[in-house]
Amino acid sequence: MLTVYDFNRITFAHHRGIVPPMPAQEGKKAVEKRYVCSANMKLMEYGYIMARDLFDACCKAEYNDFLKTWSALYDCVTEDGKAISQISPIWPNFPDDAMKADLVDLYVVNFLNYLTCGEWQPDFDPTKFCPALDRSHLPAVKQIPACDEEEIYRYSVQSITGHSPLSPDEASCVFDTLMHDIDFTSELMDRMKPKHIPCKENLALYVSRIISRPEWREQACFRDFKSSTDVLRLAAAMSDQDVSLSKAPKFRNFKRGERRQLLELLEHTDKNEGFALHPEEFKRLGERLHPGDYSYIFKEDYEIFTKIRNGVKIETYNSKLQELMKKPVNAELLSAHLMMRPGMFARNLDFALRNCSNEQQMENVLFRFISVCKSIEPRVLVQLINHFRNRNNPVHLASGKANGAASKALERDIEPLSEDICKRVARDIFNQLWQVLRAEDTEPKSVYIDPDCHCNKLIFPDNPRQVTSAVRAAACGSRTNLPDGNVLRAFLYWKGNDGPDLWNGIDLDLSVVFYGEEKAKFVYYANPKDETLGAIHSGDRRCSGKNGAVEYVDFDIKKCFQNGFRYAALTVKSYSGEKFSEMENAFCGVMVRDGKTGEQFEPATVKDRFALTTDSDQLVMVVIDLMTREVITVDKSVAQFRLACRNVVTDYAPTVAACTYAMQLKSLSIKEMLGMRYAQFLKSDDWKHASVIVSDEPEKFKVTDKDTPAPRIVSPYDIPGIYDLIFGKENQ
């Protein structure tokens, strides 16, 4: 059974704070304030601090209750540090001992460590200690506010009813961890009863967890199954398969009651389009559902399954569309046909425009689209605006829908559209979108954006499924500033089951690519040192071991830039071929250091931290602009042919392509999206009057007047929360 401490772990990870301990009962003594202060100081060592409301609530609790809450919170905060503290890199006094060694010694040490299956290390001075970390230039500590017990349900409802598929980690958290608990699911169903679920993938995952309950038909989402593809996704979810349908699902054997429920849902949907689009998948599903057993009840189901099994061609809207898209294209007829399905029009707007013979035809096509675009899903309009904003960028990446799908640079061979046309299309859709988002407002709403969040540099995640879980989860192309410090330390930790043969254990590699206009250098296991860049690798761990393994790469920002390298890309590669999702625990990131003080892993200096959980064996984390001192999120796996010796050198071209793609993006920012949703941006003096505040520092916005309602505060890194602000109907 889940406890409040389990809920706190989730709300803490999503920037929503924790539920504080209950106040001491009358006659019971509250904890002494000095204990709470000491606990808060301990948190600061790891880059966190209690917000005022949480601190005050802890001071009112009994000692034992406070200690339980504090211990659970401390476990969350110190999880990474505890994992890494059990191990050391190959060079125990890194970076000093490794930097003093010559290149031959570095190679020999790596080799000897490999021969001993990770046991042997070079001699080191056990009495040597690191000077205490200089805390004068650390990143701002992350505040932990108090939240109520309802917050975990708000998070779950916002995640499920959001307008976008959840990332694998978010989906696992909601549907596997939380909804695995019977009591939690019952409470959640009560709150979800009147809610509709616009995203069909989330609908399939949610219903698959509750379909065995007799009361599930009382849920409003029961009426959200509109097409046969929706039911196909549900069958995939019930079989623990990919609901994106990027891979053909393998259906399990369904119980008789489940077969009847699936067929009943299917009977009342539009079937032709889905069956024509996924014929093989429906053949396999039919083999599990046995529609012939229910032919007297679900006649339409039986007829369509019979057609698909016998190879009968099904005439659909799409079949007519395919005919109209054949060369030569009549843009007028095509756009007229597309108006019948606005969503399809959005998907094919670019095709229709580039096949127009003159500007007047373009005007007609665009006019027709604008006339129907208000009925299109808002998130699709966001993606369409981003498409036309970035259409003429030099580098384009194609990414699959599957978990961990690799991205590949495209050589585009399509008819051009002028930049003026692209800007015009994006602007016209933008003007329609803000009207859609504000359509149900009875009065203008206002928002205050904390300038320290730099929301104008944070890309709005139009596809959260592709966003890796992180301390500050951000979409590809988002930019944040580096704090003071001249040395960057990339880090990688992993722990997994090596198997009986440590010679062939799990081998992950941390690498850094330095590149400028016409040159590149690499610091990785085969080139562990470059003195001109002040760069040093901590050694190549070749297996996980019983406690995990760690690798670091240090480099000097000034030296890199002075030697003509403007960018540094941080990458992780599974050399042994295991996917990140197969690890027991794996994460990577970057710290900002002064090069003189602190332990090897100092949580308070962590700038970005990414969880390695996807079905991928490679990740480009971030690229750092050494001139502007900006960290640009890349968060892409790059596609490349499989090589036994594949490394950062062989992947240089796709890595740089992924970084270039991220840096050139002109997609909608979080600030632009908030501007569409809210009629007024408030100035700093007026934040108390805001409908909502977007900030990662809730302590700055505390209302002292008890009669004044406190504005809702949402972190820009809380993706379900941001989606609810912009697309939700209850976002005051």
Predicted regions, residues:
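Intrinsic-disorder/low-complexity signal
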Residues: 1-732
